[in-house]
Amino acid sequence: MPPQRAGAAGVAHVVLENGGAATWRSRGADGLQLSYHWLDRHRNAIVWDGPRTPFPRPVAPGETVAVDVRLVAPRPPGRYVLRFDLVEEHRFWLSEIGVQMLELEVDVEPGIAERRLAVVVHGAPDQRTAAALAAQEEPLVADAPAATAHLVAGAEPAADWSRLLLDAHAEGWDAVGPALVPAGGPFERRRAARRLAPWAPGGRNPRLDRPLLLPSLVAGLEPVTHDRLPAYAGDGLFEGRALVRLPMRSGRRRS
């Protein structure tokens, strides 16, 4: 089994022997399936229903079969117990009826190997943005980043923005979006506050029903555009504590 990184998908090669009296049969998505549970060290379930892997053929008593199992490592990093299990779909898990299953202690590593964040500023150079980036708690990099954050000219991230983004990536989130705070005069702020309400500061939300705006993305992911801002519409974390002041006087945000 390869090293596991929080939130990342991988493949484990598993060899099983049918030590029972009945043939193992998968019937598409039904029948007997191979799956797994992620447990903490006290055997409490962290992720109970892992993806199902059907057997490639019937496995008679006494036979062995090799199966490649798609694993998704849990969040956050730490030490977990990985228990492989067989499930008779819609009926029962074999471990629940006393069948002993293989358990492994697994150290799940951070989602990023190094805390290296780069920034792409979309638009012309801006002194406000440059000053805010220079004041970050965790310095930014130009080479070999683990993740790249996307801003627009005039945006001013808070000093802890880089740290909070890297914390979330280390937890296993490939995409992280900050909270947006409208800047400008009172009228612009009031109007923008209604439009930006879904991205207002607050807690963390892994199920935001809107695209992440001004996202930070691990290598391999690219932003799209939403409301003329860099965005990401896939799975990700809205980090409502990471604040970015967004200019409202620009034509970019006027309707």
List the predicted regions and their residue ranges.
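Beta-sandwich strand segments
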Residues: 24-25, 91-101
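Short beta-strand and strand-turn-strand segments in soluble, beta-rich domains
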Residues: 35-55, 98
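Short, surface-exposed loop/turn segments at beta-strand-coil junctions that are enriched for proline
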Residues: 70-78
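N-proximal low-complexity "stem/linker" segments adjacent to membrane-targeting elements
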Residues: 109-135
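Short beta-strand-to-loop acidic/aromatic patch adjacent to the donor-nucleotide binding site
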Residues: 143-158
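Conserved donor NDP-sugar-binding/catalytic core segment of glycosyltransferases
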Residues: 160-191
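Short, flexible, basic/aromatic active-site loop/helix in glycosyltransferases
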Residues: 179-184, 188-216
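Active-site donor/metal-binding and catalytic loop motifs
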Residues: 232-254
